[in-house]
Amino acid sequence: MTAFGGLKVVEGCSLQKGWSIMEKRYYIAYGSNLNLRQMKMRCPTAKVMGTAVIKDYELLFKGSLTGAYLTIEPKEGSEVPVAVWTVTEADEEALDRYEGCPVFYYKKDMELDIRGIRTGKIRKRKCFVYIMHEERKIGIPSLSYVRTCLEGYISFGFDEHYLSEAQIRAVKEAGYED
């Protein structure tokens, strides 16, 4: 593991050695995996633990040959609302495949103060998050991808301006602004 911006980077996408099948792992979602319907299909045993905010990071749409997808990158003074899921080993393997880890996204560990979904109680937990490789360029997402993410934002009661700001930046950087 290496440190970056105060976070530990988990090299590659293999599961942590010694991870017990009974141990809970906490996964941070900020994009399409906020969508409850989609997560139920992809990771049927995952459970929503709560919500949190990643401070000093911003939400961006970045691209590949197949389109533009959300990622987060460090930016002082910014923040990103997230949901935190408990996942099993099988769920994490499904997420690795979906996220294209380690080629498209890589994993980082971070500690977050998570507000429990049922109790509202704040708990500090070590979680993992997928982050797109930084050299990817800003891109314009498909409407269907944005809708999927927006459904998740609505489900969790997140302010939609974070998503809108990421879209506006993508359009401006692509040269489509008036």
Q: Where do the protein language model's features map onto the residues?
A:
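Initiator methionine at the very start of the polypeptide chain
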Residues: 1, 21-22
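Intrinsically disordered/low-complexity terminal segments and short unstructured peptides
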Residues: 1-2, 70
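N-terminal amphipathic/hydrophobic targeting modules at extreme N-termini
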Residues: 2-13
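Short, Lys/Arg-enriched N-terminal segments with co-localized hydrophobic residues
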Residues: 11-21
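Glycine-aromatic micro-motifs
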Residues: 22-178
